[in-house]
Curated annotation (Swiss-Prot):
Origin species: Arabidopsis thaliana
Protein name from the UniProt record: B-box zinc finger protein 19
Lineage of source species: Eukaryota, Viridiplantae, Streptophyta, Embryophyta, Tracheophyta
Main location: nucleus
Residue spans of biased composition, Low complexity class: 154-163
Cellular component per GO, a single term: nucleus
Amino acid sequence: MRILCDACENAAAIIFCAADEAALCRPCDEKVHMCNKLASRHVRVGLAEPSNAPCCDICENAPAFFYCEIDGSSLCLQCDMVVHVGGKRTHGRFLLLRQRIEFPGDKPKENNTRDNLQNQRVSTNGNGEANGKIDDEMIDLNANPQRVHEPSSNNNGIDVNNENNHEPAGLVPVGPFKRESEK
């Protein structure tokens, strides 16, 4: 099962843009991401051929169709109905689409011209240079894109993060959120 392009809804998607949360075909990707400098910096990864169906974590026989985020398990239809009864119906469950993502560094099973062109057009380093070298680099989808040849920001050298005694903006606290009591 292929994912359709979120923009045109006609062609099969070959790219996933993390910033836009959109799966796009090649023509729509070029329209959306090559139209301006800011959009061209979005981290995009190629969508691979759909993988085989994972097996259910409970019965280990039937193909899994659901993923329960509370239980952290993949479930077939039958096991999902058995496990999620009563109060467990409130568990957030998601449909498994069996869509693999191609990350830089993944070794393709067969090396054809179409895949090489796709890898050369999609930037893996965030600065717009698409040189086709994906074997030595890994990308961090959580990292901010590198800014090249741009004027400095308008904060005039003030360290915004240290001025208000907050953690750096890229760090996310681990554990439950605790609200400090107001004085």
